[in-house]
């Protein structure tokens, strides 16, 4: 008797969860555009580096194009070597999934279904990866590593100010 009731409860829960997952609407993500140009990447890096240095943070800043290929990388003297791969990973993650890495971090922190992101290849669920948009299209992304997640995000967003120059 109890195994049948338990089976019924489990099946009901699974059906309820699958319906709610399937009914979720896919967000509107920006389309990919032409790859970022080197001179634009350099302007973004300069703004990001200035923000990091202003705060005394040692960081690595990476720019990738709309295909996730490295365009430019800056490592502030004394930054840990591990941040090189992490900054590139954050930038690639932002481009590949067409969203800031903070969105991934928030999903993982919320738990539940968001935890499955941890097992996906190329996901860096840490703040510090931001899309670089031009005319509403993704031309690349910036990835920053070396500080706390919030510091990495602050420097990445400061770098985006380089688009305005």
Where do the model's predicted regions map?
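Flexible, solvent-exposed loop/hinge segments and secondary-structure transition points
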Residues: 22-165
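Hydrophobic helical h-region of N-terminal Sec-dependent signal peptides
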Residues: 7-15
């Amino acid at each position: 008797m109890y195994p049948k009731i338990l089976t019924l409860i489990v099946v009901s829960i699974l059906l309820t969860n699958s319906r709610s997952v399937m009914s979720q609407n896919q967000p509107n993500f920006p389309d990919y555009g032409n790859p970022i140009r080197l001179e634009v990447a350099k302007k973004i890096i300069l703004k990001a580096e200035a923000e990091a240095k202003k705060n005394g943070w040692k960081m690595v800043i990476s720019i990738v194009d709309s295909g996730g290929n490295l365009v430019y990388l800056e490592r502030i003297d004394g930054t840990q070597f591990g941040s090189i791969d992490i900054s590139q990973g954050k930038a690639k993650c932002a481009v590949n999934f067409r969203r800031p890495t903070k969105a991934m971090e928030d999903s993982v922190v919320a738990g539940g279904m968001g935890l499955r992101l941890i097992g996906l290849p190329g996901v860096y669920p840490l703040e510090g990866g931001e899309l670089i948009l031009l005319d509403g299209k993704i031309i690349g992304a910036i990835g920053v590593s070396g500080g706390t997640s919030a510091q990495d995000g602050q420097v990445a967003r400061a770098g985006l100010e380089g688009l305005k120059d």
